[in-house]
Amino acid sequence: MVFDKLLEQAGINLEFEDKEIKDSDYLGDVSDLIKIAVIGVGGSGNNTISRLYDLGVQGADLIAMNTDAQHLHQIKAHKKLLLGKSITHGKGSGGDPRIGYRAAEASASEIADIVKDYDLIFLTAGMGNGTGTGATPVIARIIKETARNNGLPQEPLVISVVTFPFKMEGKVRIEKAKAGIEMLLEYSDTVIIIQNDKLIELVPKLPIQVAFRFADEIIARMVKGIVETIKLPSMVNIDYADIYSVMKGGGPALIGIGESDSNNRAVDAVMEALNNKMLDIEFGSGDKALVHFTVGPDVSLEEITKAMEIVYERLGEKSEIKWGAMIEEDMGKTVRAMVIMTGVRSPQILGNINVNALTYSSSSLVVPRDSKIMSESKVDEIFSSIDPRASKLRKGNNSSRINKIFKDLGFYEL
């Protein structure tokens, strides 16, 4: 099975060992150079934070934000913030994104105080419910505004990683997710959307609740790989400037994850990560890529070099490619490859849209941010158009641009 190692590390069929994070584990002066935070918003985002804590990710502060006090209390994190105490009284958003949005706005000063010192911030959430959908775009906006208000020479890089609902979860939740993604596009440098139904195609025999854990594992491993390759001594390091050059203004991006323990493991892992079943992707000379390998102690640099030749072949010799590799003892004979590619083009994408291309990997859809900041009136328009009690969802002239994008792709047609 292609993802045996990832499933094992997720604690699926095998118990994983919790690893407590201690301040002494950090790398002192080196860690102080680039400050990184991972903020989980809402129930799904909070679960990812707990998983990262269990994994023992080093070099990033893990922060949980939620409107549900009971769930927040159970989460393992370095910092926690109960959003909108005066609005929800710690009882959650009831699945309403407008409540999540207002709760984050009510906690704006507390959020600004938490995020003010970071250079790179990952936001993770599940789209389609209340807090993650409504609060995450507000938090992303506050991150950017705080940097501007403090006169920082460079805004922090904001990378949002969100899940898109299973089709079986229904049209209302899907519609909420689309609206949340539309808002998030305005405030993030890159938005990575992990389509739950695509994950099920990778591991079709998993029970539904275990599938949610697998989605958490995909996000956690991706974030952990990027953070620790920046922050820790690695076989081959990737620095913050590399991440910034790929994720800031890189245009449409493609993310894929693959792993293999075959005789040709590094090449096979990269091929799996590059595999794209949904769109006919064209790679041009202007493309950029970030490639990260997680390997066992017996993997040679020659193996990885051969795998990188595949990436150069697919993207072209003139492409700018950043890559790194980290050794993890528990990988054994398995090699995992994570590939982030920007500047990809697809002839199947339609529409004259500024953020004009979405593209799939075997598990993910990535959208670059529009440089324009959405107005408050637009925010109100989006959320006021969503009402779970209404018998008719947004149609016709009220359809958002994200609806058109998803319809053009045949993602889900409502």
From Swiss-Prot:
PROSITE patterns: FTSZ_1, FTSZ_2. The keyword ATP-binding does not apply. It holds the Pfam family FtsZ_C. GTP binds at G130, T131, G132, E169, R173, D216. Keywords: Cell cycle, Cell division, Cytoplasm, GTP-binding, Nucleotide-binding, Septation. It is found in: Cytoplasm. SMART domains: Tubulin (SM00864), Tubulin_C (SM00865). The keyword Cell division applies. One of its GO terms (biological process) is protein polymerization. GO terms for molecular function: GTP binding; GTPase activity. InterPro entries: Cell_div_FtsZ, Cell_div_FtsZ_CS, FtsZ/CetZ, FtsZ_C, Tub_FtsZ_C, Tubulin/FtsZ_2-layer-sand-dom, Tubulin/FtsZ_GTPase_sf, Tubulin_FtsZ_GTPase. One of its GO terms (cellular component) is cell division site. PANTHER family: CELL DIVISION PROTEIN FTSZ 2 (PTHR30314:SF9), CELL DIVISION PROTEIN FTSZ-RELATED (PTHR30314). Essential cell division protein that forms a contractile ring structure (Z ring) at the future cell division site. The regulation of the ring assembly controls the timing and the location of cell division. One of the functions of the FtsZ ring is to recruit other cell division proteins to the septum to produce a new cell wall between the dividing cells. Binds GTP and shows GTPase activity. Belongs to the FtsZ family. Homodimer. Polymerizes to form a dynamic ring structure in a strictly GTP-dependent manner. Interacts directly with several other division proteins. This is Cell division protein FtsZ 2. It comes from Pyrococcus horikoshii (strain ATCC 700860 / DSM 12428 / JCM 9974 / NBRC 100139 / OT-3).
